[in-house]
Amino acid sequence: MPKVALYNQNGSTAGDIELNDSVFGIEPNESVVFDAILMQRASLRQGTHKVKNRSEVRGGGRKPWRQKGTGRARQGSIRSPQWRGGGIVFGPTPRSYAYKLPKKVRRLAIKSALSSKVNDNNLIVLEDLNLDAVKTKEMAAILKGLSIEKKALIVTADANETVELSARNLPGVTVVEANGINVLDVVGHEKLVMTKAAVEKVEEVLA
């Protein structure tokens, strides 16, 4: 079982914590992680692109000139695709880009991402994370005490509005609850900070 240091809010070591081997100690599968990131990014696409086809462009109901006798090429509408200002053929229409990977693949991806953080010594586990009031300065001090200088993902067991608001103005810091942890967030932040309760909750779901 992988073992990591357990810290308090002051940045001092408060002992060790053993992590579940089937969640934090597997061999990371990079290809599955990549697939999961593509899936998440696809679902974030807006998909509101739209062009007008020949039936939607204004005008063009009258035949521009008679079929025969003019010496010109026959035309049925000034809004057919070959005309300037005409409709677009096979253009983009509003659609959803979202798709889902199988549940087993999604679970393997998040386990691989978590195990990578352990392997790279980028997982920090806190005994607890409690703030008396919304204080960005206090949250910044906690992160500094943990020697976190780059992007960090903070995972709490449940929704914690005080922590979320305190970290909101810190660049590169994101707060999610354990139920909302995902591959894109884990991979997109160098440091992963989890409370002990959040670790237990994640292990309960994924083990």
Swiss-Prot record:
Gene Ontology terms describing biological process: translation
InterPro entries in the cross-refs: Ribosomal_uL4, Ribosomal_uL4-like, Ribosomal_uL4_dom_sf
One Pfam short name: Ribosomal_L4
Compositionally biased residues, Basic residues: 60-71
Gene3D superfamilies according to UniProt: 3.40.1370.10
Cysteine pairings via disulfide bonds: none
Similarity comment text for this entry: Belongs to the universal ribosomal protein uL4 family.
UniProt name for this protein: Large ribosomal subunit protein uL4
Source organism of this protein record: Bacillus licheniformis (strain ATCC 14580 / DSM 13 / JCM 2505 / CCUG 7422 / NBRC 12200 / NCIMB 9375 / NCTC 10341 / NRRL NRS-1264 / Gibson 46)
Primary gene name: rplD
